[in-house]
Amino acid sequence: MRKNILRVAGVVSLLASMFALDAAAQDFQKTYRIRANDTVSIRNVSGDVKVTGYDGDAVSVVAYKEGRDREFVRVEDTSTANRVELRARYSEERRNTDASIRFEVRVPRGVAYNFNPVSTASGNIEASDITGNIRFSTASGNVTLKGASGSINATTASGNVRIEEARGSVNASTASGNVEAEITRLDGATNMSFSAASGNVRVRLPSDADADVEMSTSSGTLETEFPLEIEDSQYTSGKRARGRLGNGSRRVRLSSASGDVRLLKS
């Protein structure tokens, strides 16, 4: 009899856990039908944001509230017919709240959107297989993109920026961390900049890139697989490298105040 009671209790506990998970999954869930070049804006405060391209025809957003004080944070939706606009809002009655929101966004693969901005104050931002005007930023966390195309701008105050298999133009910066960017195809003639105040910068460009290139580091080494001339700075400590690749149709700047700078072929 006791064994049967324990079994029933176990089943009840399992069902309760399942219902709790279902409830968590329903913190926020909505689908939006916007057109190409419309805006997707996610403003988070604490928590990660993930954006993924998929084989669908609508923008889908799911948000999970996490933490002991999760009831004191909510998702504010001010979206319009041509704009997905979501923001994390915290109760003014509660300070030092142990609560965060994790956003998971899916967008139709191959459709260009204006991701401006996608941001979080404390958390990581990750994206794959997305296209458009991409503006990602976090104050404390990493920014990671893979297979993105368009105009990409990724920044963090404290964390790493890693961009793989990008197509288009890229600007990336961090105050404390490393910048790694791989660009497999350059489109247009947009200028590009890669910088780290305290960290390393490593960029890969197509071997046939057209660019007016400048590399610099105040405390570190320079390395390049392109025909650039590396020289010591005449007036300050550090090293510089300059050169024109092809027609020099765009400016490309790589810099670090304290770290190594490398420009390689993708």
Regions found by a protein language model. Name each.
Residues 1-266:
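Intrinsically disordered, low-complexity terminal regions
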